[in-house]
């Protein structure tokens, strides 16, 4: 809808109406969720009254993030539709820096809080951790208004629904709400299962709860691959497909979708390799306060989720493509199958497996839930593209990328112990040791080895998408983007001469 609005003569007025509507709705939802915080905590968390009270306090501090994440998405999509990706992509870095300052201050004042009792968490400590996290998310959203002004759109509140495409957005929004409901119902099952795992392991086997992967391990593992990589790449690709669909150019949209899926497959298969080959160094490099023991607990779900990363990322692009066609029903049907598979499989798995394996099982189920319903997704997508979505070419590309990834995983797993020894590190739940510098060194060395092997395999398999994927990544990194048209080259030459 944003792409269509930008083509209108009074685009600024309509976009201001759209942003104002989004702000109003987000405020209403955020306030409602804040009022329902105790109930939501009971839905998601199992534990003692003290645990529930602490979870409620943290949740209440984090509730404003609903508003700011929503605002970030709306404003960011406007920037993306105008091909301004830099601020949208890098504002999250600022949010992470603010969060790290808060967590770093916490560690400096109080030490690591992993094994402290519940009464350790006083109001000031909760505010310092959850509060700075929310402050970072607020920065991530609000800073986007600066580039929004630079592209010629000065936001001012304008209330009104006429002319913003609400009639066409309404059904899509309704189906999207349905997706959120389905997703959260499955998340309730998953979160309660993973939260119970450490407590039940202690009751049944006498195992220290800190030695069992719980919900924190699952959530951290999930956030690493998906939000940092897949969402960023899908955001960069989506406006191009939207413009083609808005112009009723199905042939161009088909080319864009095919290229996007094939490029995403090449990129995501490499990251899947990284998560399988070196999960512990990656976790320790990105989360310096985590111990080796905790990193090992997080490694299981990270590996299993990494396997499904190429398919979850492909779905993200396909979902946005359906939205470009103003079709919210098809993504809803897919998510109904995917989340149904997750919820049912987790319930069955919790009955058959010991609690020590639950979180890894959840990661595996999450990966499979995006793989198994692919035929359904393919059938629905073909109808939108006149029964032709360049399927054979996409399938061959993914088979080549997966083949190269499997070979790279085998070689990477074979050499990783030698790399650990080279930097003086050791992986073990009891006697493991790896500091931050060693983790970064291991991750870098193994990434280089994996990259060389992966590229070699892609070349051997004659993958045409590899070069396109490299060009796509380079185009999103400031300073590396190459001009692709005569006008672009002239503008770059003028800029360089001006300097």
Where are the regions that the model predicts?
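Membrane-embedded alpha-helical bundles of multi-pass transporters/translocases
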Residues: 1-499
């Amino acid at each position: 809808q944003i792409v269509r609005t930008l083509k209108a003569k009074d685009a600024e007025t309509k976009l201001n109406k759209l942003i104002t509507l989004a702000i109003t709705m987000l405020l209403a939802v955020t306030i409602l969720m804040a009022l329902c915080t105790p109930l939501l905590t009971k839905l998601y968390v199992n534990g003692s009254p003290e645990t529930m009270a602490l979870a409620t306090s943290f949740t209440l501090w984090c509730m404003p993030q609903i508003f700011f994440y929503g605002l970030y998405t709306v404003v960011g999509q406007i920037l993306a539709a105008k091909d301004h990706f830099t601020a949208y992509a890098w504002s999250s870095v600022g949010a992470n820096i603010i969060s790290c300052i808060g967590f770093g201050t916490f560690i400096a004042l109080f030490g690591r809080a992993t094994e402290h009792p519940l009464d350790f968490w006083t109001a000031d400590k909760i505010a310092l951790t959850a509060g700075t996290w929310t402050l970072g998310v607020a920065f991530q959203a609000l800073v986007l208004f600066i580039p929004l002004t630079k592209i010629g759109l000065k936001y001012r509140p304008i209330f009104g629904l006429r002319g913003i495409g609400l009639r066409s957005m309404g059904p899509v929004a309704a189906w999207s709400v349905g997706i959120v409901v389905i997703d959260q119902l499955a998340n309730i099952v998953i979160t309660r299962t993973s939260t119970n795992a450490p407590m039940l392991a202690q009751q049944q086997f006498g195992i220290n709860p800190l030695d069992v992967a719980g919900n924190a391990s699952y959530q951290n593992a999930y956030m690493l691959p998906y939000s940092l990589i897949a969402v960023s790449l899908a955001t960069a690709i989506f406006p191009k497909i939207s413009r083609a669909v808005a112009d009723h150019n199905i042939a161009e949209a088909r080319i864009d979708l095919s290229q996007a899926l094939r490029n995403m497959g090449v990129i995501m298969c490499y990251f899947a390799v990284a998560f399988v080959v070196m999960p512990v160094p990656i976790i320790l490099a990105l989360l310096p306060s985590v111990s080796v023991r905790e990193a090992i607990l997080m490694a299981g779900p990270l590996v299993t989720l990494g396997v499904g990363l190429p398919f979850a990322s492909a779905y993200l692009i396909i979902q946005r493509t359906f939205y470009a066609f103003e079709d919210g029903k098809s993504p809803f049907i897919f998510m109904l199958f995917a989340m149904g598979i997750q919820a049912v499989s987790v319930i069955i798995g919790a009955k058959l497996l010991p609690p020590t394996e639950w979180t890894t099982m959840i990661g595996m189920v999450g990966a499979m839930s995006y793989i198994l319903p692919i035929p359904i997704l393919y059938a629905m997508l073909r109808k939108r593209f006149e029964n032709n979505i360049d399927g054979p070419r996409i399938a061959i590309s993914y088979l080549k990328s997966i083949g190269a990834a499997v070979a790279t995983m085998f070689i990477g797993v074979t050499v990783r112990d030698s790399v650990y020894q080279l930097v003086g590190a050791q992986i073990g739940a009891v006697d493991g040791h790896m500091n931050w510098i060693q983790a970064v060194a291991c991750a870098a060395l193994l990434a280089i080895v994996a990259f060389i092997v992966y590229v070699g395999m892609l070349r051997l398999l004659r993958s045409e998408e590899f070069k396109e994927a490299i060009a796509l990544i380079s185009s999103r990194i400031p300073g590396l983007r190459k001009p692709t048209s005569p006008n672009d080259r002239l503008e770059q030459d003028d800029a360089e001469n001006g300097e």
